[in-house]
Amino acid sequence: MLSPVVHDAVLTPYGRQQCVEFAQANPDFQNIPELIIASPFRRTLSTTLLAVPKTFERLSPQGVILMPQLQETHDFPCDTGSDRDVLEQIEEFKDRGFDWSVLTDDWNKNEGFYAPTPEALADRAKWVRRFVRDRPETNILLIGHGGIFREIDGRMRGPNSGVTVSLSRWGNVECRVYTFQNDDDENATMIPIQEPSLIHAIDKPIDSHVEIEVVA
């Protein structure tokens, strides 16, 4: 399980295995995304390389964006990213074409825009939704974390208890497909799409080190 005291926690061996299994179970899916947007945490960078390796190879470097705004929603050490100079020297990520320039000095300070407050999280989630909606691509793959995905979804605090339960946790390497309600909504509201035939979930116990979501 994810220990809150481990800084920028990495994937467990089991989590890495599940990523590989996802890639093997979904060969056709690798051809769908036109853009990858990933949280710059170590575990999400590993997920990107292991779960969608062919997609990464096809799109990198221009089609792979690191997005600090996709980081997790708490200030625990495990949910705090590493400094740019640390990430650049990690063997797994070196020479893979990641553009680290987006990692400003404050990206992992959990303050201001990145503070773990309800107001800041709502603003950050809206920022992500609007960024994605304004992109020219149709099929965009977000690789991030359950906490920020719940904020991006926006229905967690709604009256529907079934939705709340569904959003309470993402399964390991689980994909959820969304579209936008319209093109000019100030909030960039997203609505879920069910496409079970497109994406096969890995039916295994949840390990919170692995999160993946699709936004279409």
Regions found by a protein language model. Name each.
Residues 40, 59-78, 103-111:
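A short, structured active-site edge motif that brings together acidic residues
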Residues 1-62, 66, 118:
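Active-site-proximal alpha-helix that buttresses catalytic centers in soluble enzyme cores
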Residues 37, 138-148, 152:
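Beta-strand elements within well-structured catalytic alpha/beta cores of enzymes
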Residues 3, 72-93, 150-216:
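Acidic, low-complexity terminal tails and accessory targeting/binding regions
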Residues 5, 96-116:
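Short glycine/proline- and acidic residue-enriched helix-loop micro-motifs
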Residues 42, 70, 147-149:
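Catalytic metal-binding/acid-base residues of hydrolase active sites
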Residues 121-137:
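A short, acidic, amphipathic alpha-helical segment used as a generic capping/interface helix at domain edges
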Residues 28-32, 132-139:
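Glycine-rich phosphate-binding loop signature in dinucleotide/nucleotide-binding domains
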